Amino acid sequence: MTDPLVSIVTPSFNQAEFLAETITSVLNQSYPRIEYIIVDGSSNDGSVEIIKQYQDQIAWWVSEKDQGQTDAINKGFQQATGDIFAWLNSDDRYHPQAVSEAVQFFIENPDVGLVYGDVNLINHQGKGLGQFNAKETNYQKLRRGRVHIPQQAAFWRADLWKEVGPLDPAMFFAMDYDLWVRLAKISPIHYYAGHIWADFRIHGQSKTITADDKCWADMLQIHRRDGGSWFSILVAKYWIRKMIGPFWRWYKNRNYFDFIL
C-alpha cells in the first residue's frame, strides 16, 4: 500500500460552535491524500453555512434528516472510496500529524487492521484538561469491557469495514465499541503509544457527560450478543455504574463546570 487514500467522515448536527475547528483540523493535515465527507442531520444552527465555506475542499457532503449519529456515519462510509477509514465527530479535532502517522504505521505493519493513539481532553473553550492515554487491548479484553480505545484517534483498514460494517443502527451510544470488538475479532489491533492524534472535547452536551449510563447498556447488549457471561467483569461494572450512576453524573457535571469557570 503506497500513498493510500484516507476517508474521514464527520457526522454533524447542531454543533456549529465547534464545527469549523473540526473541519480545519482535517483539511490542515500534513498528509495530502484525504477524502473528507460530512453528513449533516439537517442542522438549524448555522452548521450548513459553515460547511458551505469549505465545500470546495470536501469530497462529498449532505444535509438531510437522518436517524442519528450512527446512521450519519454509515451514510458517510457508503460514499467513501479510501483505503483507510476514520470518523471525527463535529466537536473534536485532529492534531496535524495524525493521519500521516497512522498511514505510515499501516504501511510498515500490513498485518494490523486497526491502530489508535492517545488524545488530549479539552473543554468547551478548547482549554486543555489533561491527557487520556489509551492502553493496548485485544478481542478478549474488549469483550470484558476494557475498551481503552479513544474513537477520535482510531484508524482502520477499509477492506475490514467491508467485512464487519456497517455500524449497528440499533447502537446510539456504543457504536464505536461495537466496531472495535468486531474488528479485533478478525484482525490484530495496535496501540501506538506516545502519539497524541486528537483533541476530545468534553462539554455539557457531549455524550460522555449526558449518556454514560446508556453507553454501558449498549456495551452490555454487545457483550451478551457475543456470548458473554452474566458473571463477567463487564456485567459487574455495568451494575456498579447503574447503582452509583446518579452520584457519578452529579460529580462529573460538577467537575465539568469547575473546569470551565
Language model features with spans:
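Conserved donor NDP-sugar-binding/catalytic core segment of glycosyltransferases
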Residues: 93, 97-129
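Glycine-rich, basic loop-to-helix element that forms the pyrophosphate-binding segment
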Residues: 64-80, 101
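Short beta-strand/loop segment that forms part of the nucleotide-sugar
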Residues: 24, 33-42, 62-65
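Short aromatic/hydrophobic "clamp" motif used to bind/position activated sugar donors
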Residues: 85
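Acidic helix N-cap motif at the loop->helix transition within catalytic regions
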Residues: 17-20, 45-53, 97
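N-proximal low-complexity "stem/linker" segments adjacent to membrane-targeting elements
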Residues: 1-27
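Conserved nucleotide-sugar donor-binding catalytic segment
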Residues: 8, 132-222
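A conserved acidic beta->alpha catalytic loop
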Residues: 32, 40-49, 89
